[in-house]
Amino acid sequence: CMVCDMVVTYAGNIKEYKFYPAVMRSHARLTYTQVWNWIEKGGDYPHKAQIEPLYKLFQILQKKRQQRGAMEFESTETQMLFDDGGKIERIVPVVRNDAHKLIEECMLAANVCAAEFLLKNKHTALFRNHLGPTPEKLATLREQLGLLGLHLGGGDKPTPKDYATLAEKIAN
């Protein structure tokens, strides 16, 4: 696997990073549910020395992302449960908790470092860019939102924070 070793400030800024190859050896075999139960209960638990600072990092990175106005997309993942014969018995929704989000937030930070590394070192790479709506589509959106008593800020170029604010108003 490839490791992205990062130094992150208490303000959530990535100060430095390096990439290097490694072999992953998972001795603990933890589940998201186990980790979340330990974090919620507090006290003493296995691997606390590793999990507690990682959870604090997650909280810092999440707060930083919210301040930037990043959109939160909550989706329901599913899990297949199999019978003894190996056939699908049923499909159930996976309940996401902060242990899931902790891993996702760290992966996002590593992806940002990877993109920066590729750009800084002038490596050819594909990036997925999310273009904003055309002026016509933006006008139509604003018209429809107005009918619902809603407003999208940001003038001609709404930022992700403007969209996140709107999404929050809709959710409430």
Language-model region placement:
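Conserved, carboxylate-rich catalytic/transport cores that coordinate ions
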Residues: 1-172
